[in-house]
Amino acid sequence: HISAEIMQLHHSKHHAAYVNNVNVVEEKLAEALGKGDVNTQVSLQPAFRFNGGGHINHSIFWRNLSPSGGGQPCGDLLKAIENDFGSVDKLREKLVAAAVGVQGSGWAWLGFNKESKRLQIATCANQDPLQGTTGLFPLLGIDV
C-alpha cells in the first residue's frame, strides 16, 4: 500500500517537475539546433535524459497502479513469469532484491526482452529510462 500523500507528492511535485523541466530543455535544444550550436546541444543531454527519463518512468509507474490493486497475474503474463522465474513469488523475491540493491535513486524493472522473448529484471540509476538504457520493454517499474 502506498499512501495518498506519497502519491500526491510524486504526481504534483516530482512528475510535474520532470515534465516542466523537459519542456524547458526541449525549448533550449530547439534553439541550439536552430543556431547550429553543437556545444549547447551536447551540454543539454544530461538534463534531457534525467527529466525526460523521469517523465517516461513516472508515466509507466502511474499506469501500473490501481486503487484496489491489480490482483495476481494471469494468462500469457503468468505463463511467462512461471517460465522465466518459476513462480510469481520467485519473481517478487528477485524484483524486491533488485530494488533493495539500487544505491541512491533509481528504478527496479520487470521488462520484456524482444530478442529472447523472455522477461528480465533490470535496474536503472536515477531517472534513466529502461528501454533507452537496456533495450527492454518496461512492464512494471518500482521507484526507489
Curated annotation (Swiss-Prot):
Assigned GO CC terms: mitochondrial matrix
GO molecular-function terms, A-Z: manganese ion binding; superoxide dismutase activity
Cofactor(s) essential for the protein: Mn(2+)
Annotated compartments: Mitochondrion matrix
Protein residues bound to Mn(2+): H10, H58, D143
Cofactor note: Binds 1 Mn(2+) ion per subunit.
Keyword ATP-binding assigned: no
Class of the enzyme per the UniProt entry, highest EC level: oxidoreductase
Keyword terms: Manganese, Metal-binding, Mitochondrion, Oxidoreductase
Reactions catalysed, as given in the entry: 2 superoxide + 2 H(+) = H2O2 + O2
EC number: 1.15.1.1
InterPro entries attached to this UniProt entry: Fe/Mn_Superoxide_Dismutase, Mn/Fe_SOD, Mn/Fe_SOD_C, Mn/Fe_SOD_N, Mn/Fe_SOD_N_sf, SOD_C_sf
Main location: mitochondrion
General function of this protein: Destroys superoxide anion radicals which are normally produced within the cells and which are toxic to biological systems.
Name of this chain's protein: Superoxide dismutase [Mn], mitochondrial
Origin species: Eptatretus stoutii (Pacific hagfish)
